[in-house]
Amino acid sequence: SLTDCLIIGESIPGGTTTALAVLRALGFDAQVSSSMPENPAELKNEIVESALKRIDSDHPYSIVAKVGDPMIPFVAGMLSAASGVSNVMLAGGTQMAAVLAFASKIGFNEENTVIGTTSYITNDQNVNFKDLIQKIANVPIISIDPGLKNSQYSGLKAFSEGFAKEGAGAGGTT
């Protein structure tokens, strides 16, 4: 293998909403995080319910095409291929749960896979991240507190105040 561990991060606008739609369409009861301190869960649920009406097949590829975003199948494909020859960390939260759910339908090596995220996701009382991951696949979750509450930079400190919480692989890079 060219690497001991491939770390895959993501950052996509609206990603928690498309992730929620994919998770629900694939049969997982998910409550997802938000990049905002006040999670607009009701709005997300309305959008997802509307999107789910477009689904006309239970085939995973059709589901992702109808309600997902391009990141989900792209990263799931990377996971499927790379986990056969290397360790892979999905560095992220809600969106990586959707990647894992899709990958569980197309195949990947669970033994070489881990989720790495921030404690801002795993400690969020409004979501079921840890339970959700356990229902999707038998992969470990690594959760880290990046200590951003002590940052002198307001943009970084905002993560600890409920903004963003994860993104661009933050949990996996710490």
Question: Could you describe each region identified by the protein language model?
Answer:
Residues 1-9, 13-174:
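N-terminal loops that bind phosphate or other acidic moieties
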